[in-house]
């Protein structure tokens, strides 16, 4: 029996014969035909994305803060935080997004891609982020992270352990509403949870404060007689998303690296860890400790907070600033974005012939008790505006004076 030797006829998916053998048409993932393919360039040198970061030179904090030329830029608070970190020689940053902080940590990721931050990753949630920051800081690296509102409360347990462990990490708190009715507008009630944990705490009014406080916070936190975490708080959206003028140093300089061996407590040797991290010390049995032993440690933490005053005065120019206090009929005492709104209230009062002074509080911990007592000695009326229901600032002011 004879067999047909005809060539097999190829058909398309519909069964029609393919009459021409043209090359198969390539398409992109959307199914559109690709009409041309660029040939790879020969001899092309790949650009190093870290080239600019590698050119940064280390300068002293004194030069960075007081001598380096500055240029004025119109940027958001998130961008100001990014530029501060760029110049701060940060070893590690860990992110977990939450509004209004998300943009800040996204921009820190850009810095990582450019080589200005050595290590960067996303944590699983805020508790994990703050715990990982604790471990990294204990190992001796300079750490930066940020959170906001509910994220602050979720990460609060590890955060409040930082001071007792004497960890000089820096966290930015972009304050927002934490309780119902939930909103993302500024409400800084979360600061009340941070005031008495032993952390040094600054409250920035605007984008310039955010830029300056972050860089200076690293240096203050790592001083040998301090060795404490620093929190830099700002009011979300009013600062993080709004734009303002910021005077910045050039990108080509950075702060000296952290010298962990200078700290008040030894760092953990990650290469040769102890066989048991939680050995029973002479002052405790398992997790039992007499309260007076715990209290002595807390007293030293708060003594270190007080010792930071001289460095705040040295690098930040004081815990407070005062405007038109002498001879004023009333004095407004505020921190954060309430300072900017207080200035507008003072302007309106001046139009009506009422002289009102302003005290801007930069440092919440340590709190400026002697400064307030001196500035308010002759005050007839004191008003404390703030964005929270518990009035944590008003209570501190009342206790101070």
Each PLM stretch: what is its role?
Residues 2-9, 16, 21, 32-199, 307-401, ...:
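Thiamine diphosphate
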Residues 229-321:
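Conformationally flexible catalytic loops at phosphate/diphosphate-handling active centers
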Residues 99-100, 150-151, 176-177, 206-208, ...:
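Short, glycine-/Ser/Thr-/acidic-enriched flexible segments
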Residues 155, 181, 241-243, 341-343:
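Short helix/loop capping segments that flank catalytic or ligand/cofactor-binding pockets
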Residues 145, 171, 231-232, 332, ...:
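Structural beta-sheet core signal
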Residues 208-214, 218-244:
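Conserved anion/nucleotide-ligand pocket segment
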């Amino acid at each position: 029996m004879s067999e047909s030797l005809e060539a097999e006829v190829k058909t398309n998916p519909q069964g029609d014969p393919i009459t021409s053998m043209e090359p198969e048409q390539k398409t992109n993932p959307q199914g559109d035909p690709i009409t041309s393919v660029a040939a790879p360039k020969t001899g092309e040198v790949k650009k190093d994305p870290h080239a600019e970061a590698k050119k940064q030179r280390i300068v002293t904090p004194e030069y960075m803060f007081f001598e380096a030329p500055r240029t004025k830029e119109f940027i958001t608070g998130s961008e100001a935080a990014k530029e501060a970190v760029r110049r701060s020689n940060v070893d590690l940053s860990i992110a977990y997004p939450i509004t209004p902080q998300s943009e800040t940590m996204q921009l820190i990721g850009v810095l990582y891609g450019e080589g200005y931050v050595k290590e960067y990753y996303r944590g699983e949630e805020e508790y994990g982020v703050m715990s990982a920051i604790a471990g990294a800081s204990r190992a001796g690296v300079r750490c930066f992270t940020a959170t906001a509102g509910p994220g602050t409360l979720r990460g609060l347990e590890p955060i409040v352990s930082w001071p007792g462990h004497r960890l000089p990490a820096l966290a930015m708190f972009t304050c927002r509403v934490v309780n119902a009715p939930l909103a993302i507008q500024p409400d800084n009630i979360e600061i009340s949870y941070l005031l008495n944990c032993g952390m040094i705490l600054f409250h920035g009014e605007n984008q310039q404060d955010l830029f300056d406080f972050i860089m200076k916070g690293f240096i203050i936190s790592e001083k040998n007689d301090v060795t404490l975490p620093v929190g830099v708080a700002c009011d979300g959206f009013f600062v993080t998303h709004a734009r303002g003028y910021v005077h910045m140093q050039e990108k080509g300089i950075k702060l000296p690296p952290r010298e962990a061996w200078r700290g008040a407590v030894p760092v953990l040797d990650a290469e040769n860890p102890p066989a048991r991290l939680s050995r029973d010390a002479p002052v405790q049995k398992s997790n039992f400790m007499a309260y007076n032993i715990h209290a002595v440690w807390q007293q030293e933490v708060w003594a270190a907070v007080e010792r930071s005053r001289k460095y705040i005065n040295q690098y930040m120019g004081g815990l407070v600033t005062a405007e038109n206090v002498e001879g004023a009929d009333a004095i407004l005492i505020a921190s954060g974005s309430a300072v900017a709104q207080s200035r507008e209230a003072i302007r309106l009062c001046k139009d009506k012939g009422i002289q009102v002074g302003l005290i801007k509080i930069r440092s919440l911990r340590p709190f400026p008790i002697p400064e307030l007592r001196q500035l308010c000695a002759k005050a007839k009326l004191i008003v404390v505006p703030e964005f929270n229901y518990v009035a944590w600032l008003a209570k501190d002011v009342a206790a101070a004076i």
